[in-house]
Design a protein with these regions (language model features):
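Mixed-charge (Asp/Glu-Lys/Arg
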Residues: 1-24, 134, 157, 175-187, ...
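Nuclease-adjacent, charged terminal/linker segments that flank catalytic cores
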Residues: 1-56
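Hydrophobic, Leu/Ile/Phe/Ala-enriched alpha-helical segments that form helix-helix packing faces
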Residues: 27, 88-97, 155-159, 183-187
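Acidic-basic catalytic patches of nuclease active cores, encompassing PD-(D/E)XK
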Residues: 57-107
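Active-site metal-binding core of divalent-cation-utilizing nuclease and nuclease-like domains
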Residues: 101-125
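Conserved catalytic cores of phosphodiester-cleaving nucleases, focusing on short active-site segments
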Residues: 119-141
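Catalytic cores of nucleic-acid endonucleases
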Residues: 134-191
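Domain-level recognition of nuclease-like catalytic cores that cleave nucleotide substrates
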Residues: 170-220
Length: 220
């Protein structure tokens, strides 16, 4: 099955960003063209635009674009997620301890896929060292869309945080990250806690480092 932006593997941080930026610019340009070319009745404008097809097979189509058409709302969702993904990759690339690391897998459009993670990073010896799930959630409610539960499951932390030498992150919006990491949450028996790290990017993307509840001193 084709995706709006196809997965790719075995690439360095720089090349990954170049590919994603090109695909992102294309999606934005096609979405804008759809809006400009629309002529919907004002009384049904919102529902019509939301479902309006965006043509993805016109113009200079980047190699990562896998679909020929997609609903406007889904194109917007993927564009926002890719913006978070690019912020996350830039942040990982800037960390001194990640020098020489590269991307084993990148899945820009395959959210909630239990077969892998949105971003998998390896070290110079080809060992997996980082797993990351990426989302752009417009909510300050930790239970929004059950997204956290899905990401935690995909990262293998729903029962315990594996002590396998792999660091695990959720890359998301500031408002959602703050809700997830809040010490005021009803943590109960959750086996994990978060360390919230701001990327200092212009879009307020945050990284949530997942830690074992047994080892974390921040929050209860």
């Amino acid at each position: 099955m084709p995706y709006i932006i196809e997965p790719f593997t075995n690439v360095n941080f720089k090349d990954a960003l170049l590919r994603l930026r090109k695909a992102h610019r294309f999606l934005v340009s096609r979405a804008k063209a759809t809006i400009i070319g629309s002529d919907f009745d004002e009384s049904r404008w919102g529902s019509s635009v939301k479902r309006s097809p965006v043509k993805l097979n016109e113009g200079d189509v980047p190699p990562l674009i896998g679909k020929t058409e997609e609903k406007f709302s889904e194109v917007i969702n993927i564009a926002a997620t890719v913006e978070r993904l690019m912020d996350g990759i830039e942040w990982f690339a800037a960390q001194p301890q990640n020098k020489g690391y590269s991307i084993l897998e990148c899945h820009p459009s395959t959210s909630d896929d239990t077969r892998g993670n949105d971003l998998v990073i390896i070290d110079r010896d080809d060992r997996i060292v980082i797993r990351c799930e990426v989302c752009d959630v417009v909510s300050s409610n930790a239970d929004s869309n059950r997204k956290e539960k899905k990401d935690i499951r995909n990262l293998g932390c729903n029962e315990f945080v594996p002590q396998d030498g792999v660091t695990r992150y959720i890359c998301t919006s500031l408002e959602f990250a703050a809700a997830l990491a809040s010490p005021k949450r009803k943590w109960g028996s959750k086996p994990y806690r978060y360390e919230l790290i701001e990327t200092r990017g212009s879009s307020s993307t945050c990284m949530l480092l997942i830690q074992s509840a047994d080892n974390n001193k921040n929050g209860k």
